[in-house]
Design a protein with these regions (language model features):
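Short, charged, intrinsically disordered terminal tails
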Residues: 4-7, 62-72
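N-terminal acidic leader/helix
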Residues: 2-29
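Alpha-helical transition-metal enzyme core signature, strongest for iron centers
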Residues: 17, 21-25, 47, 51-61
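Amphipathic alpha-helical coiled-coil segments and their boundaries
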Residues: 7-10, 14, 40-43, 47-50, ...
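Short E/K-rich amphipathic alpha-helical oligomerization segments
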Residues: 22-46
Length: 72
């Protein structure tokens, strides 16, 4: 069972993870464009997919944060 301290940590960690993932996703998009520019379309597609998946992860983390805030 989560302790109050664990819940407090989650309130700090979730926004941090969301921001961190967004920064990585932006970097992935930048590198996908660079890969595309040098003719590496398949590589670019995989990197872009990773960026998109981080976006999905952030949606889940944001939903978790919202539920945590509603429970408070």
């Amino acid at each position: 069972m989560a302790t109050t301290t664990d819940l407090e940590k989650l309130r700090v960690l979730l926004p941090h993870w969301i921001e961190h993932n967004a920064e990585h996703a932006a970097g992935f998009q930048e590198w996908a464009e660079k890969a595309r520019a040098v003719g590496q379309e398949e590589v670019a597609e995989e990197i872009a997919l990773a960026a998109k998946e981080l976006g999905w992860a952030n949606e889940a983390l944001s939903a978790a944060l919202k539920k945590l805030e509603q429970a408070a």
